[in-house]
Amino acid sequence: MREKDPFFWITLSCGTFIAAYILLPLIELITSPSIPDLWESIKDKDVAGSIWLSVYTAGSAAIISFIFGTPLAYFLARHDFKGKRFLEAIIDLPIVIPHPVVGIALLGIAGRNHWIGRIISDLGIRVLGSVTGIIAVLTFVGLPFYIHSAKSGFESVSPRLEKVSRSLGASMSSTFLRITFPLGWRNMLVGIIMCSARAISEFGAVIVVAYHPMTAPVLIYERFEGYGLKYSQPVAVLLVLICLFLFFILRILTLRKAGET
């Protein structure tokens, strides 16, 4: 039997360490609360309301990202132009900016001292301490994930198919809806899930813009600060299970796509 190279054992050790580093805290978190504690958390109106609010606002952010991000993702996938790299860098900014800073920045333009804030206020839209503010924040942090995934899907569709469709008299919109969209939908759905998963776990920006109404991460923080680790764990487990469900769907979609290609 051939002796394993030392480099093999180094890579195996690093992989084992990283897997344990990620899994052990999650396993400890999920197994720590008792079933009665989890059931009490599920029946708790505050917990149910915060989780529903997190799911609703994250889903709304994903829908907004889909509506406004899809045309931009398609444009970036099909066109090379001066300033494209700069635009892509702007899209990536929400990923690298500290999220409390995101909340402060959004409040800066939504306040009465800014002309945009005055217009928003005159329209009867309230950002600070509102569901609208939460959705605005979650859209900001989740949008890059959707755009990148959708762009990758559009790039995988051959432009020749679109040219054939156009040569047969189809309009650009008809070509997109009948050719590009059906072929790129899987990446778009992956982007929606990634955007939702990122949004549902957001804490730093949300707590600046809207401590109330409480999303699940904010409720977890409040219970940890007020009552300690044990009281916050059941809520954290429920949120982790939702995120794992989204991750499971994401893995199924990506594996199916890999199998098709």
Predicted regions and their residues:
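Membrane-water interface segments at the C-terminal ends of transmembrane alpha-helices
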Residues: 2-36, 45-155, 183-199, 203, ...
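Surface loop/turn motifs at the tips and blade-to-blade linkers of beta-strand repeat domains
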Residues: 41-42
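An amphipathic alpha-helix/helix-turn recognition signal
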Residues: 46, 159-160, 179, 215, ...
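Ser/Thr-centric signal marking residues that sit
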Residues: 54, 130, 175, 180, ...
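Short helix-to-coil transition segments within interhelical loops
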Residues: 79, 154-158, 163-184
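A broad detector of short, well-ordered amphipathic alpha-helices
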Residues: 162-163, 218, 230, 234
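Short hydrophobic, aromatic-rich alpha-helical segments embedded in or entering the lipid bilayer
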Residues: 211-225
